[in-house]
Amino acid sequence: MNSLPEDLLAMILVKLPIKIFTTFKIVCTQWESMVDSPYFRDLFLSIHQNSHYSSWSILSRCDEEVIAHYGCNTWGLQRSLHFYISSFLTKKFETQRNNYKVWSYSTDVGMILISENCICVKNRSLYVANPVSQECVEIPSHGYLKKVSCPLGIATRTENGVLLDYKVVLFNGSDTFRRLLIYSSQTGMWSINTVDLTVSGFHNQSPISLHGSIHWIASTSHSEDVAVSFDLYATGTSSVQCRVTTFPDFGKHPKFTRSFSTCQGSLMYMNIISITKVDGSLEIISARLYWFLKEKNGRKVLPQCQPTPLS
């Protein structure tokens, strides 16, 4: 196979599971260089992301696994993501395992944010970990800020699949989401950031980190579900960019509790709703619809969603 052109060889190897083509790195330095190249990584993602949904965001806050990881073999995982997370927590905290939980998942690099079960604590313990590789970092104390806090999420910045830095975000328990406590791995410091946001509460799903932003579902003062996005790496500004978006099925009664997932590098919302024809003569029950939240002007924000029927 050494006589094959490198681009053709890459197309052959990229269709194999990760655990198989990574073993080919020992064949020769040429293969090792190719498998480790940004081109090969981007090619692998472009081929497989269209047929595999990420399960990181499907895992809710509860201990029960909502969905198994589809395509674990392709992505080099021997067990489901829930297994890796649960076993990591048990190994890390041992007898104190039930005192800690995962508050947020980063779909970009597979990192999780761990803290105590208690919702509001003045000086909570915080850990950023990769449950598959078993790597774990304890975040420096924020007790000197003397603020009651609750974990919101973790945002990451990557380049060619390499983690450059991350930010851990807490919100002030007494201020709801108006005042954020943000830790930057780049500076190793905590800072306080104020945002103009009047929503409250989480749904039963952990916030999702994607492309440097944290997304979650909150409620307005009128008990309406909205999608909230904090862009922690907004270009040209040191402040957090915030956007609140009404769901595209607003005013309707979806069959399932609203929740997010990720697909092909975008945030996705899917539900089943009832639709009435234009003439009002017939109501179609259980029409399945899904929406993607896409980029606007090159920025990772939450614009108006566009519905597309599922075939």
UniProtKB/Swiss-Prot annotation:
Residues 1-43 form the F-box domain. Coiled coil: none annotated. SUPFAM superfamilies: F-box domain. Gene3D superfamilies: 1.20.1280.50. InterPro entries: At3g26010-like_b-prop (IPR056592), F-box-like_dom_sf (IPR036047), F-box_dom (IPR001810), SCF_F-box_component (IPR050796). Transmembrane segments: none annotated. This is Putative F-box protein At3g28280. The lineage of its organism: Eukaryota, Viridiplantae, Streptophyta, Embryophyta, Tracheophyta.
